[in-house]
């Protein structure tokens, strides 16, 4: 009888531990914030791109943009669920919406745009994000692949990036 009681207690204890472990697993971010799945960037835009711009002191400097399959400069991109946003964001109280915006300030949405894509805040309040569009440009009389980086509703050109630092310097 005593052995049976110890055995039963042991089984109940291990089942309890197993259930406790299931409950402690972190919830998926996808479900919490309306993420459908990771956004896949167009293949033509992937890689390291270099562009020439002025820094805060006014001197010209080469900047790098790294685009991978699902990220721009290590910022992961996701596709948002419109159903989730309609239910939990657009029709939520101002207080809840502001809390949601604060929680998701480091999550970015990716959208297809022409042959490129657009990156915007998870909940866009103003502006239209940054566009990355593959184009062909002439540098010193030769056609080369470039990345048109643009912002705003226009979209308005911010820079043209190239596959090498040398091309970025030559293009000016």
Predicted regions and their residues:
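Mature, Sec-exported extracytoplasmic domains of Gram-positive
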Residues: 29-172
């Amino acid at each position: 009888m005593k052995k049976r009681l110890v055995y039963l207690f042991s089984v109940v204890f291990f089942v309890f531990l197993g259930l406790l472990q299931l409950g402690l697993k972190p919830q998926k971010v996808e479900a919490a914030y309306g993420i459908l799945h990771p956004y896949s960037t167009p293949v033509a835009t992937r890689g390291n791109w270099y562009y020439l711009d002025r820094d805060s002191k006014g001197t010209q400097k080469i900047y790098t943009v790294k685009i991978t399959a699902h990220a721009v400069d290590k910022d992961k991109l996701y596709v948002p669920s419109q159903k989730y946003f309609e239910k939990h964001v657009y029709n939520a109280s101002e207080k809840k919406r502001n809390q949601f915006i604060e929680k998701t300030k480091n999550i970015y949405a990716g959208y297809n745009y022409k042959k490129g894509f657009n990156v915007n805040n998870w909940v866009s309040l103003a502006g239209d994000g940054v566009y990355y569009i593959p184009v062909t440009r002439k540098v010193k009389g030769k056609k080369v692949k470039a990345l048109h980086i643009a912002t705003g509703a226009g979209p308005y050109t911010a820079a043209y990036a190239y596959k090498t630092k040398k091309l970025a310097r030559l293009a000016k």
